[in-house]
């Protein structure tokens, strides 16, 4: 595109995380400036100049590599202002552009010797050990310069491919090879460190190994078979992603953008810096020292020790503390490596990407709302007025209550009855989403119809608690408002709490009464021994219907556990009842009265039931009436 102000919009199907090749790592950091100069390699451990407070060239904050630290201004100050956009200063080599490029431009460190990636070496499982079919302990011995490994046995009869040799064993074999009477023509080749590991990984033909393993699996059983399956699974993943095993050994290390590992000047003139800068500095110092030792052809033992120290420095940068001693800074505090920044609850993914703050959302403590219906939740007025503010403003203007947005906001701040009336109209039929972290399954976020309540706590129906794994001991929940009509429809149709009764994992009901509800049901239907059973026909305790009993209870003429006679023509089951009536009376009108222990049944001459009075408690009447009422409505 000719105009750099125009932005292109990229659409992605998916994001894939895979191993980066050494060339890709170089491509991330390498750039060709408009004048043809190639920049990107960080070669100096310095950060900023203590006198000028400007970044050092080729250092960890280099303006030539990462971009200018001030908008439209080069390092030396020759070019200032936006009119010089895109020019590369011929004096300092800095491109004149915006300083925000320092948030995404990367660099790289070219390593003087290959180093193993600690994630693939010391992770669980160790992919390097699985691919090479060598125990992890032996792989570590090779990488950290404790043992040699045979890369090519040559003509030596006692040596085998991938065999480990100690220093003394290799010296003995060397004496044997270079003896005057030696008959060995093809000398064996051994290696040590990450270079040897890289050679072993390069020698792997994944397709051939996969074929051999598949043949071997058919004839093996038990633990051996499980081990082969684990190995073939790793190999298949490498083949599927077009990744090469030798990429697990690094030849170059990416340097993340400087604004993501800043250096800030404090009031006293001192500097606070990100731990990553210290870790990068250790790597660069050791890398430069190793390059210098190789240049002057230093003794092998010194070079090898420096390579091991470089390996440990890179390990600490990627994942401090995974292997060996943890690198500490001031006050014996462990330095925060790249892995520490990414992983865990406070890491980049969970804290900043998945757990980021969004508009039209709120958060509050939950309390029980026993009078709510299952698909309802109590939303505090204070929260609702804030969440639904754009809708309320729109309706206030549309109803000509106010003329503009500013006046609407002033009116909303007063929160008078007129605003509350409009808010009530807005939230009617507008579902909201409630989410409780951690959202471990799809029922961790459900839709509810909001009901305005006082206070500052969200009210939740007790039946939906098992799905959220919530209780009322201080749990908090987040509220989200679906804005688009499609989102509202989806929330109502698919996510409403009353539509999510079965667990997606087991298919069994997840909406089950528990704790307070079970206790309440028991208390409601329990029999109290200190209440006397009344005589049948007593005016105070005989009622014509279940509704009459409930009216009397609400009128406080009856207590919850008091015995009453109530007319009920439905089926009655009672374990304490006898098989036959205690007594049968013939009445004057030809009807018959059966006297049972807990009921009175009256039949006509054709044995049809005329009326039935049941002796029960007020609590049991309430329970039965509630169930009958709910069933009849469905």
UniProtKB/Swiss-Prot annotation:
This protein's record includes keyword Ribosomal protein: no
Residues reported in the UniProt entry to bind Zn(2+): 74, 76, 89, 92
Alphabetically ordered keywords of this record: DNA-directed RNA polymerase, Magnesium, Metal-binding, Nucleotidyltransferase, Transcription, Transferase, Zinc
A GO term, aspect molecular function: DNA-directed RNA polymerase activity
Alphabetical GO biological process terms: DNA-templated transcription
Cofactor note: Binds 1 Mg(2+) ion per subunit.
Cofactor(s) the protein requires to work: Mg(2+); Zn(2+)
EC main group: transferase
GO cellular component labels: DNA-directed RNA polymerase complex
Record-listed E.C. numbers: 2.7.7.6
Catalytic activity: RNA(n) + a ribonucleoside 5'-triphosphate = RNA(n+1) + diphosphate
Gene3D superfamilies, per database record: 1.10.40.90, 2.40.40.20, RNA polymerase II, clamp domain (4.10.860.120), RNA polymerase Rpb1, domain 3 (1.10.274.100)
Binding positions (Mg(2+)): 471, 473, 475
Keyword hit for Magnesium: yes
SUPFAM superfamilies per the UniProt record, alphabetical: beta and beta-prime subunits of DNA dependent RNA-polymerase (SSF64484)
Domain of life assignment: Bacteria
Reported function: DNA-dependent RNA polymerase catalyzes the transcription of DNA into RNA using the four ribonucleoside triphosphates as substrates.
Family per record: Belongs to the RNA polymerase beta' chain family. RpoC1 subfamily.
Assembly mode: In cyanobacteria the RNAP catalytic core is composed of 2 alpha, 1 beta, 1 beta', 1 gamma and 1 omega subunit. When a sigma factor is associated with the core the holoenzyme is formed, which can initiate transcription.
Protein name as catalogued: DNA-directed RNA polymerase subunit gamma
Lineage: Bacteria, Bacillati, Cyanobacteriota, Cyanophyceae, Synechococcales
Gene: rpoC1
